[in-house]
């Protein structure tokens, strides 16, 4: 039995369909997931690399896999950890958007906000209406992110990347 296709099922449905499979997957990747979750403590992300065509991109995938871990926590009965993790994921995504370091980083941030907020809504739909939210949720949803601010920062960063990339290629052509 394989994993259900991501497009047709919610994260909770996918985890419920194969809880033991996900338990093993999460156990094998626990250290990487813990490191990714620890990044939520940082208030920004800036790439240390110059903007060029050959600039390496961070491995964003572990950040997106935290949604699966939080869904597994919920399915396994650890509601507090699941809710806290989803709210931390929303905040982490918002910070990536606000950093404006690169267009791809902002897009990953938007995906994190969407995935974590969707999971949070799915979990809350199954819980009593008076369910208390963890403290992480206050910061995650404290104030709306001005769309213009996030988009402007991302586009400025993309402009810097494109300009730097072209300059690096011109430098290579002139040197040859």
Residue locations for each model-derived region?
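Short acidic linear motifs
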Residues: 1-176
């Amino acid at each position: 039995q394989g994993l259900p296709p991501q497009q047709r099922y919610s994260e909770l449905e996918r985890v419920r369909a194969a809880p033991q499979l996900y338990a093993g997957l999460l156990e094998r990747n626990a250290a990487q997931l813990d490191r990714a979750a620890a990044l939520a403590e940082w208030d920004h992300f800036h790439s240390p690399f110059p903007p060029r065509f050959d600039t390496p991109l961070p491995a964003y995938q572990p950040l997106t896999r935290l949604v699966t871990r939080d869904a597994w926590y919920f399915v396994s009965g650890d509601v507090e950890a699941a809710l806290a993790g989803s709210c931390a994921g929303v905040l982490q995504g918002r910070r990536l958007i606000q950093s404006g370091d690169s267009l791809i980083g902002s897009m990953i941030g938007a995906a994190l906000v969407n995935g974590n907020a969707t999971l949070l809504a799915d979990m809350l739909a199954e819980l009593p209406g008076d369910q208390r939210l963890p403290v992480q949720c206050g910061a995650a949803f404290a104030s709306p992110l001005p769309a213009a601010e996030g988009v402007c920062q991302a586009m400025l960063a993309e402009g810097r990347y494109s300009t730097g990339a072209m300059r690096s290629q011109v430098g290579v052509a002139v040197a040859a």
